[in-house]
Design a protein with these regions (language model features):
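Class I S-adenosyl-L-methionine-dependent methyltransferase catalytic core
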Residues: 1-174
């Protein structure tokens, strides 16, 4: 679904700047082209640290053991880039430290996640990654804004429910 969404965004009239208010894993954002500037925001500090780290050449591991997973989960601030990678890429269902990802076929989730992330990041080398609340993001005039918020009545990164009503009020003010 990321490619069709990116096509719609690229057909949007006007704007030199593309702004994503909730970039997440950048599945859509990595496919958007034709803008001189990309501002990609998310409020998850470890996710943004990971994206910035990979953008700057951080060498992600290809293997993470369950013991390493637990250690990184308990010591996130020792290496925020690695914590972001392991917390999402090596976790069950990609949920932030939602349990060590494993299956019966022995899939190497670290290797799979690294490969996928590096592929997407190849198109985001010039992107500006921002960690913040979407309501406080400085959006340049005439930007094309993409907002794919958390689903209504779901638990967000911090355990708080996303306020969909407040989101729509903020969107109407843009």
């Amino acid at each position: 679904i990321a490619k069709p969404i990116a096509q719609i965004i690229m057909q949007a009239a006007g704007g030199d700047c593309f702004v994503s208010l909730f970039c997440g894993s950048c599945a859509v954002e990595s496919k958007v082209q034709g803008f001189s500037r990309k501002i990609l925001n998310d409020r998850h500090e470890y996710l943004i640290a990971m994206l910035q780290g990979v953008q700057q050449g951080y060498n992600l591991p290809e293997h993470i053991t369950p013991e390493q997973y637990r250690y990184i989960r308990e010591n996130k601030d020792a290496d925020p880039v690695l914590a972001g990678f392991v917390g999402f890429g090596c976790s069950f269902g990609g949920k932030w430290f939602g349990g060590y990802a494993r299956n019966k076929t022995g899939t190497n989730y670290a290797e799979q996640s690294k490969r996928s992330l590096l592929k997407d990041m190849a198109t985001l080398q010039d992107a500006q990654f921002v960690c913040g609340d979407y309501r406080r993001l400085c959006i340049p005039p005439n930007s094309v804004i993409y907002a794919d918020p958390p689903y209504n009545n779901t638990t967000g990164y911090t355990g708080d429910k996303f306020d969909t009503t407040e989101f729509w009020i903020a969107m109407r003010l843009l």
